[in-house]
Amino acid sequence: MLLWVFFLVTLTLSSGSHGSLPSQPLRIPRYADAIFTNSYRKVLGQLSARKLLQDIMNRQQGERNQEQGAKVRLGRQVDGVWTDQQQMALESTLVSLLQERRNSQG
């Protein structure tokens, strides 16, 4: 009978340790791994958010540059039209002056 009691006590103690938490030396590395994994995920999330923000800013800057380029081109076209009009007015004035001079001489 004592043998059975000893056997049951031994069995109970040995099976109880399997259901309990792991020993302290095994928990520390897993805890450290969890901390590292969580921190690493946060860093990766921040990097991807930063990259997305930079892409958005680069697109907006590109659009601004295109708008400024369009304004410059439009300004050049307007300047070109104005210059052409001035040149035509000057040419017509010179032609009329030459005709008047020829008429007065002839």
Swiss-Prot record:
The keyword Secreted applies. It holds the Pfam family Hormone_2. InterPro entries: Glucagon_GIP_secretin_VIP, VIP/GHRH-like. Keywords: Amidation, Secreted, Signal. PANTHER family: GLUCAGON-FAMILY NEUROPEPTIDE, SOMATOLIBERIN. Residues 1-19 form the signal peptide. Residues 20-30, 77-106 form a propeptide. This is Somatoliberin. One of its GO terms (biological process) is adenylate cyclase-activating G protein-coupled receptor signaling pathway. It is found in: Secreted. SMART domains: GLUCA (SM00070). The keyword GTP-binding does not apply. GO terms for cellular component: extracellular space; perikaryon; terminal bouton. Its main location: secreted.
